[in-house]
Amino acid sequence: EDVRSLLGFSSTRFTWRVSGVSFQIMGLGNGLGLCQYGARGMALLGFPVDEILKFYFTGVELKQLEKPTYLKPLIGKTIVLDPGHGGDSGGSGPMGLSEGYVNLEIARALAALIIKDGGNVVLTRDKNEYVSLSERVRISNENKPDITISIQQNIFPDDQVGGTESFYYPGDIEGKKISEYIHRELVTALPLSDLEVKQADLFILRETNNPSVMVKVACLSNPQEERLLSEPEFRQKVAKSIISGIEAYYHD
């Protein structure tokens, strides 16, 4: 009578039967992965994806990946910056400006812009010290970056020679594209002669396992260009030109 009243049946003559029984059993398994049949069964029972994964993999947490946006175009990208020379390595200009110092200051300014764009940055050196070429390559390859950018200056016997040039390794298709984008921004923004984009069999370009470019920003041996390189505003303009080239490459 209680059942009839609870279910609202008008008749006292009714029967019932069990239509099905469901068991959830954790198998013996080797615990190395997901069972597609078990996972499908849980899905049919209405379990959400994160609960199914947690059932098979301890400590798993689903997170929504960030995607590049107009304001953060480098999200998910890692870029290795290689400030050339350092320590007693490298030359200096007529006024005594050290190439290692200039390269590091430009790299630091560029690193800040990359981070602002949402990217990750690895520096092959972050102070005025000597780092061997093989160590620079090791740092780059170990971090598996999307791009490696080596920042250097030219020093020529003739102090009247000046300009900016960029290099990529022969056959590095993406390296060529990146160097062209960066170089275009540099020659557009800076009051320097265009020494063009060139192929070069340079150690840092050859031995890195990712698209790599070398930017020779200016000629430190040229007194006028040394003066420019000594100015923080000019170095910031260089960094902005390089980041603009990187952004253009990823927007293409």
Predicted segment positions?
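A short alpha-helix capping/helix-coil boundary motif
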Residues: 18-19, 88-91, 114-118
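Short glycine-rich His-centered loop
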Residues: 77-96
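Short, glycine-/Ser/Thr-/acidic-enriched flexible segments
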Residues: 28-29, 86, 220
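Short, flexible active-site loop motifs that bind/organize anionic cofactors or intermediates
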Residues: 29, 42, 93, 126, ...
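Conserved, single-site charged/polar hotspot
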Residues: 1-77
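Active-site-proximal helix/loop segments of hydrolytic enzymes
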Residues: 77-78, 97-252
